[in-house]
């Protein structure tokens, strides 16, 4: 991607490590008309004429995150949500209930809810908050967590499940301690494994979420898939996020890895996985996500249920996507595994055409829905468009 700014000059950023032909085919298979892509600055201005990072011009989200607290039980050298200069903010249970009701009004009765932070599990009333979400009518409730509280307190997992929690979206960055030192600054693998064990005993579904950092853990993706296989049906998915540079990160170690890179690593490291199993999402922008789905066979091998093929945009695609998330990421005994991921944007590669089709949004304190990449976008000096965690 080439960008030009009157104030900061011109620069280029790698957004797709593959041929131009394959890039355009990926966009086309994601439901985009590549013949209508902007060809010059004037056309680009028309395509993004709304010029807003906020929600008003965006499509409905597949899921939205309620930022429950900016407290955390870690002090990580890499974190895209945290602002060390921000004062303590933890909305009350009543405030959270009001925001969830407002979100349901905006997004529809089949909306999905996520609890984020900070670390949401440090809230003393996290179980009450979960029960409140269920009472409001959410049947898919997801906890985005580092797993520390779940690992040290097996009763917490059981109580959360009893209160209505369905899915644990667990940071899980590798099968050695090397990537945990890079991201968390300390060894964490045993804590992650204990969290998975306690979730399994509680009947919770788990999605392993890996921030893919070149040179740190991109050689361990196959091992993560194997661990997921061994822990089915508790583990329902492996979600890979190529590192983006916003929030807190080491400014002297910026290394890009793109969706094609991640898919190639999976193809090379996993005997059961082929690059041809993956395709783009048809609801969000094709450049944002990739996914495949597998069933565990009697022989212990993963069998692909998906293939790279053209996907047409549907008028009610958001509802189909929500239905699919329920079918694949909620507790069940079926041995199905999704493998996919999302490439978040930062100040070097932010694209308003992608923002406009954001499928994961943040519930703002005032009730608005903000695209995730807009919410956490920060300049090189740390300045953000939107202050605060929520």
Go through each PLM region and give its residues.
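Short loop/turn segments at strand-loop or loop-helix junctions that form parts
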Residues: 68, 81, 170-175, 241-243, ...
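Conserved alpha-helical substructure of the radical SAM core
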Residues: 7-12, 16-18, 22, 28-145, ...
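Radical SAM enzyme core and accessory elements
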Residues: 1-46, 291-390
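A short catalytic or substrate-binding loop motif that flags glycine-/basic-rich loops and adjacent residues
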Residues: 58, 285-287, 353-354
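Conserved aromatic-histidine-acidic binding/catalytic patches
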Residues: 64, 88, 118, 184, ...
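Radical SAM enzyme [4Fe-4S]-AdoMet core and its adjacent flexible, acidic
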Residues: 189, 201-336
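A short acidic, helix-capping loop that chelates divalent metal ions and anchors anionic groups
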Residues: 87, 176-182, 247-250
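Radical SAM/AdoMet-radical enzyme domain recognition
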Residues: 97-114, 123-242
């Amino acid at each position: 991607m080439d960008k030009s700014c009157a104030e900061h000059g011109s620069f280029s950023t790698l957004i797709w490590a593959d041929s131009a032909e394959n890039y355009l085919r990926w966009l086309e298979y994601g439901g985009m008309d590549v013949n209508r892509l902007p060809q010059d600055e004037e056309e680009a201005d028309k395509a993004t004429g709304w010029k807003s990072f906020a929600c008003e011009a965006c499509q409905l989200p597949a899921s939205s995150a309620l930022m429950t607290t900016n407290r955390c039980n870690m002090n990580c050298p890499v974190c895209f949500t945290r602002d060390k200069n921000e004062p303590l903010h933890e909305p009350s249970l009543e405030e959270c209930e009001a925001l969830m009701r407002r979100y349901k009004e905006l997004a529809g009765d089949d909306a999905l809810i996520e609890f984020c932070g900070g670390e949401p599990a440090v809230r003393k009333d996290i179980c009450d908050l979960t029960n409140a979400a269920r009472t409001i009518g959410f049947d898919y409730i997801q906890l985005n967590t580092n797993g520390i509280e779940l690992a040290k307190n097996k009763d917490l997992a059981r109580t959360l499940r009893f209160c209505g929690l369905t899915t644990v979206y667990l940071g899980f960055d590798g099968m050695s301690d090397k990537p945990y030192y890079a991201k968390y600054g300390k060894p964490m693998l045993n804590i992650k494994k204990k969290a998975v064990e306690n979730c399994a005993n509680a009947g919770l579904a788990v999605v392993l979420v890996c921030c893919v950092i070149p040179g740190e853990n991109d050689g361990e993706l196959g091992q993560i898939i194997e661990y997921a296989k061994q822990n089915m049906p508790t583990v329902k998915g492996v979600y890979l996020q190529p590192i983006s540079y916003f929030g807190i990160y080491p400014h002297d170690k910026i290394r890009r890895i793109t969706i094609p890179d991640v898919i190639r690593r999976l193809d090379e490291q996993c005997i059961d996985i082929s690059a041809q199993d993956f395709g783009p999402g048809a609801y969000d922008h094709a450049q944002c996500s990739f996914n495949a789905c597998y069933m565990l066979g009697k022989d212990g091998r993963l069998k692909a249920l998906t293939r790279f093929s053209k996907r047409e945009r549907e008028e009610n695609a958001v509802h189909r996507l929500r239905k699919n998330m329920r079918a694949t990421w909620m507790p069940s005994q079926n041995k199905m595994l999704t493998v996919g991921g999302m490439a978040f944007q930062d100040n070097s590669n932010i694209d308003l055409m992608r923002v406009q089709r954001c499928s994961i949004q943040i519930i703002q304190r005032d009730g608005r829905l903000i695209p995730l990449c807009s919410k956490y976008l920060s300049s090189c000096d740390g300045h953000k468009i939107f202050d605060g965690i929520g």
